[in-house]
């Protein structure tokens, strides 16, 4: 369309009231939750940008599809519809449903990853890293240098450093690298895309070494759209065809359908290796359910199948990426430091730059995230040293490479006025960022501590 205003390419037929907790209620909620935003009740949040995973709105087609869900324990019609869509999209012949992406990771890594292994990735996200490390392996991040600099405007900051991959293979040895993973888009690094050229280069290195190559494909459609916009030779290609080419370069994928499956729950593991698939299915039956439902209801399988078809619609993707850019542009123009360019699913605020007076060991990104909620009821999530610091044997921590706050935008859920409100809150908090103070952890779990840790302010 010739007009500059972004419009949502859908009409809204059903609404849900938003809670509007006051400042006193929000302060009480923070105290009760130990200043961990995961501990807030949903009705204590005004705008919830904690995650885009499973929090979006489904379409009328998806809701209609749920009405014909087949709940048969074995051989459900809904599974075969789901299987057909996944096979058409990915080209992988073995499709294993799971209740969400981390279940696919756990099953795959339990079979394929051993103690002492090294698993290279552009950047592991939290559950991927934890599932690798739970097997006693090293989750090694080898994103390009530009991907670690929030201010660099590189078109594909999610790219894997191919030279570093080759060096890792040389250093570690082929026998200790069970697979190479590329996450599209790169969630931990700002929602940044990976180019087709980079995927081809990674594939060539893996093929030469005989190492399986997997995609963490949660946001494959958003990545495909960035390729269409930014990579030579793809401007006239349909996003679905670009996505198919991405999958064709890999030996398998894990997928959370709660992102680019446009569903509220679900995921899958898809591979070409029949022997690997058989082992994975045996473990699936033990922990998730039978092979034709994998812990999902039939109506969930229907919703995912339809979502995987809708997500590559060009009008949807144009709206999706531009609406994220809209928030990024508003706050950046006001001088708020962000990861540039904007990611596909989220805007990432650079807390280290916004609050340089807070030492990294006092978690500046956690401080910023808390203040966004305290000030305006906006819930984001810390993507920094709370989530990704490496705890060392002497009790100290190796900080994360970046201190970010992610504002993840649920799909087809909020309108432009909601995002305008978020921008106002961010700009106001940023204007007073010199008043932010640090936090210390007073309680934490061994794995994925950011979900349940409790904090106290450092005064």
Regions found by a protein language model. Name each.
Residues 22, 367-372, 427-429:
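C-terminal, active-site-flanking charged/polar segments
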Residues 271, 349-352, 409-411:
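Short beta-strand-to-loop capping motifs
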Residues 2-35, 39, 47-56, 62, ...:
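Conserved PLP-enzyme active-site core in the AAT-like
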Residues 292-301, 307-370, 374-401, 437-446:
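Conserved small-domain helix->loop->beta segment predominantly found in fold-type I
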Residues 278, 356-364, 412-421:
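Short, conserved charged micro-motifs
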Residues 311, 375, 387-459:
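PLP-dependent enzyme catalytic core of the Aspartate aminotransferase-like
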Residues 60-67, 351:
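A short, surface-exposed helix-loop junction/capping segment
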Residues 264-266, 344, 402-406:
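Short, solvent-exposed beta-strand edge segments and adjacent coil->beta transition regions
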